Amino acid sequence: NYPVQLLLEPLIGAIAGGNVAVLKPSEFTPHVESVMVRLIKEAFDSRYVSVVTGDYQVNQALLDLRFDYIFFTGSVNVGKIVMEKASHHLTPLTLELGGKSPVIVDETANLKLAAKRIAWGKFMNAGQTCVAPDYVMVHHSVYEAFLKELQTVIKSFYGDNIQSNPEFGRIVTTRHASRLADLIEGNRDQVVMGGAVDLEDRFIEPTVFKEVTLTSSLMEDELFGPLLPTMSYQSMDEIKRCLKAHPNPLAFYVFSENKAFSHQLITQFSFGGGCINDTITHVASSRLPFGGVGSSGMGRYHGEASFKTFTYEKSMVNRSTKIHLNLVFPPYKDKLKLIKKIMK
């Protein structure tokens, strides 16, 4: 996702820290890859910044080399491979991964605004955003009203013929589109909006699912597409049970006018970052370090955090030569009384 931004943003931090860098763009976006190769060659001396292209075999060969630092953005499974390879050389690294980022909507939330901001965060880039809302839990007393608002918002965003709307994107590969299509077909009975698929066009319609359970295939892995499972809840225990089944998400979103409720959620559960009464926007601030925790990644970047990621602090002492205390040097026998007096 975002192959230009996710290549250049870490590079800025690396250059700011005085490093040379090797870039490896995603092989799933070949046109972007070719453009980036050209631009990087035009802008940088290859002794300082170079680009390597190729498939997973090139990735494996690259990871066999010794680097001072590795920065990886991608899936959890590939992140594990990168970390295992880095361990051979004890290379420090940052992993920007993903996970099932939840949205919690309570009974005090502004439903119209919640629906709009959730739909915007979910369906931009056809759902292919690492911090996109992955599923929504809504208080049972406002669940049906929320679903109605959500459907209204999606229609207002993209119209009746979403496939012909140039503002709605496509899935990056046919393989990923097929994966999403299978999830839709396997959960067709719970679709309340959307569900259309055109694999040749790599089009997956924004699709909303109703009353999804924790055992559903939709709740197994990060969806990374325009599929939005929803479920109702009645108690905090139900929320906790769901969040514990999918721990350490990259993002966490709460929609509520109840400050105590929001505070309870964001302090009790571990996640990378998030928003109260919004989605996605925490990523846009250069003042806020961005990154995951646990299975959603490790390390932080953006703004000053990027500089800190690609540098390390050296602890140094510069002693004066004008003053010299013989007290610290042996033999200590004659100095013991003085030392005890000082220590009192």
Where do the protein language model's features map onto the residues?
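Rossmann-like NAD(P) dinucleotide-binding subdomain of oxidoreductase/dehydrogenase enzymes
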Residues: 1-113
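Residue-level signal for inorganic ion chemistry
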Residues: 18, 49, 70, 99, ...
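ALDH superfamily catalytic-core signature
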Residues: 44, 78-213, 276, 338, ...
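Short hydrophobic/charged patches on amphipathic alpha-helices used for structural packing
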Residues: 59-60, 115, 240, 263
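Short glycine-enriched loop/turn motifs at secondary-structure junctions
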Residues: 64, 97-98, 129-131, 164-165, ...
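Conserved C-terminal structural/oligomerization subdomain of aldehyde/semialdehyde dehydrogenase
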Residues: 203-344
